[in-house]
């Protein structure tokens, strides 16, 4: 289902087929092709790989679960309700079983994943 971004978009994660990506199972809710200002993904994280984005900033909102996130040389705690801003260039990965909503600015993040492990 695709809707023109100049009007509005509505997507239900339950209606989007997931696929495996660097962080886990991703469901794109607002995609690059939607031509919105950002991309939004619903992600089930499990065994994420350390990576960075050269051109994309990410905002993670933790919906469910708990764990940690490695950001360059730091590690922070994660649990439901926490928001994390990850600027482009920062090496990062989430550790634990988490359900997150990621907002990626600008769009095009799936072409900007640089895995380090």
Kindly give the residue locations of the regions a language model identified:
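Short acidic-glycine-tyrosine-enriched beta hairpin
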Residues: 73-89
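A short glycine-rich, His/Asp/Glu-containing loop-to-beta-strand
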Residues: 14-50, 103, 113-116
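Structural motif
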Residues: 59, 66-68, 75, 91, ...
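A cytosolic small-molecule/anion-sensing beta-strand core signal
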Residues: 63-64, 79-80, 96
């Amino acid at each position: 289902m695709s809707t023109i971004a100049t009007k509005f978009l509505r997507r239900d994660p339950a209606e989007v087929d997931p696929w495996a990506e660097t962080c886990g199972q991703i469901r794109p809710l607002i995609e690059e092709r939607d031509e919105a200002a950002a991309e939004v993904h619903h992600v089930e994280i499990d065994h994420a790989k350390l990576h960075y984005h050269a051109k994309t900033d990410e905002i993670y909102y933790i919906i469910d679960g708990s764990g940690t996130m490695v950001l360059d040389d730091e590690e922070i705690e994660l649990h439901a309700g926490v928001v994390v801003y990850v600027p482009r260039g920062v090496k990062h990965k989430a550790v634990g079983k988490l359900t997150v909503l990621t907002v990626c600015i600008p769009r095009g993040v799936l072409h900007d994943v640089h895995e380090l492990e």
